[in-house]
Amino acid sequence: INEDAPTGTGLLAFTIGDVETPAGSLTVTRTSSNLVLVPLANVVLGGSDASRTVIVTPAPNQFGSTTITLTVSDGTNTVNTNFTVNVASVNDDPTITIIADQIINENTTTGPLAFTIGDVETPVGSLTVTRSSSNNTLVPLANIVLGGSGANRTVTVTPAANQFGAATI
């Protein structure tokens, strides 16, 4: 399955039984060999009597392999079955905080507007921030100045002299 798959493995059905014990009296437990990838709370058992289910959901932004062990007990004897869940890495989108809409007077600047960037897989120092203007007459690219470093960045927007209107930066 892919990292961050919303339904994990989906519903996996299995059947339990015992010659001496009614299926509804059997106990099913579970373990995960990699609790960082799949915490025990993310191995959810369901069903009743002989018809049982399990759903395995990896922790967010984790990938790798884990062995899930299901154990059935009648109170005296136990039996185990194992299966492997392989979680493939998925490139997550970088993040950027929202900057509120700005209203400024003609021939003034926004001043530095703070924002932060991040990415689960990429160090922030390796991320590139670019800029654009929907109205280059009002706000030419040269008048959009990026600053800061690491996760903490700023943008200062200075409209062209004697211009007014709206632009999306």
Predicted region positions:
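Extracellular ectodomain surface segments
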Residues: 1-33, 59, 79, 83, ...
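Long, low-complexity, Gly/Thr
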Residues: 46-47, 55, 84-85
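Low-complexity "stalk/linker" and mucin-like segments enriched in Ser/Thr/Pro/Ala/Gly
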Residues: 31-51, 132-152
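Extracellular/luminal low-complexity segments enriched in Ser/Thr/Pro
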Residues: 53-63, 154-166
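Extracellular and select intracellular beta-sandwich modules with Ser/Thr-enriched
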Residues: 65-67, 77-83, 98, 166-168
